Amino acid sequence: MSIDAKLVKELREKTGAGMMDCKKALEDSGGDMEKAITWLRQKGLAGAAKKASRVAAEGAVDSYIHFGNRIGVLVEVNCETDFVARNEDFKKLVQDIAKQIAACQNVEYVSVDQIPAEVVEREKAIEMGKEDLANKPENIREKIVQGRIEKRLKELSLLDQPFIKDSSITVEELVKQHIAKLGENIRVRRFVRFVLGEGIEKEEVDFAAEVAAQAGLKPAEAPKVEETPPAPPEEPAPEPAPAAESKPAKKGSAKKKK
């Protein structure tokens, strides 16, 4: 459904919600203004955009260690006052965001607009070089690549991830709900995700040798196999002696019988 820009602007002025949130509310409400306002209030998005420009310098740095101690997260989430920073709803939000980061192994940035230009260009070069686009016209290739890049960049962005506890909203919408609820600007500033052994090339060790070394024993040596010496080369058979030549009998040597 196509939504008139004037309708989006009017809804924004009435609710203080963001432009994209107003557009989505109108689309889901069939263009009905009152239903769209109710939709925004139910989502907790009304009034969030007005507070988003305020300076948020308070907040909390929280951590989360996943079961098994193999994944750890540190995240900084800011709010405007220390009063809200001590609020249990805010603390729960920060902890939920930390758990979200632990669950999202591809996430590297807070939002799409924080992704460096060189990363965007690299992703574009990868997509442009794929074989399935080789025979496509240039204008079609550009549209396909743009769509793929937008999808890929959202995979790298924390705020664009579906919330792990309610996949019907994104992390960004979760934050906006708390902005409306707590009455202050809230923003995820930065985070770091640790994975045990990440980036380390593990040396392969012979398990039997390692156990023997820990026990102070020498690893058993493989039994030596005696090599059979090669047989001497066979001597060639002696050539047969040449046959003796028979001498012709002398004439007149035989006696005649009388």
Curated annotation (Swiss-Prot):
Any idea which UniProt keywords this protein has?
A: Cytoplasm, Elongation factor, Protein biosynthesis
| Region entry Involved in Mg(2+) ion dislocation from EF-Tu, spans | 81-84
Pro residues bias: start-end ranges: 229-241
A GO cellular component entry from the record: cytoplasm
Q: What is the stated purpose of this protein? A: Associates with the EF-Tu.GDP complex and induces the exchange of GDP to GTP. It remains bound to the aminoacyl-tRNA.EF-Tu.GTP complex up to the GTP hydrolysis stage on the ribosome.
Q: Name one GO molecular function term.
A: translation elongation factor activity
Name the SUPFAM superfamilies for this protein.
Elongation factor Ts (EF-Ts), dimerisation domain (SSF54713), UBA-like (SSF46934)
Gene name, Swiss-Prot/TrEMBL: tsf
User: Where in the cell is the protein located?
Assistant: Cytoplasm
Indicate yes or no for the key word Cytoplasm. Answer: yes
Organism field: Synechococcus sp. (strain JA-2-3B'a(2-13))
Q: Does the keyword Mitochondrion apply?
A: no
Q: Ranges of Basic residues compositional bias?
A: 249-258
Matching Gene3D superfamilies, A to Z?
Answer: 1.10.286.20, DNA helicase RuvA subunit, C-terminal domain, Elongation factor Ts, dimerisation domain
Q: What is this protein identified as?
A: Elongation factor Ts
List the InterPro entries. EF-Ts_dimer_sf (IPR036402), Transl_elong_EFTs/EF1B (IPR001816), Transl_elong_EFTs/EF1B_dimer (IPR014039), Transl_elong_Ts_CS (IPR018101), UBA-like_sf (IPR009060)
Q: What is the lineage of its organism?
A: Bacteria, Bacillati, Cyanobacteriota, Cyanophyceae, Synechococcales
Which family does the UniProt entry place this protein in? Belongs to the EF-Ts family.
Where primarily located?
cytoplasm
Q: Where is this region: Disordered?
A: 216-258
Question: What Pfam families has UniProt attached to this entry?
Answer: EF_TS
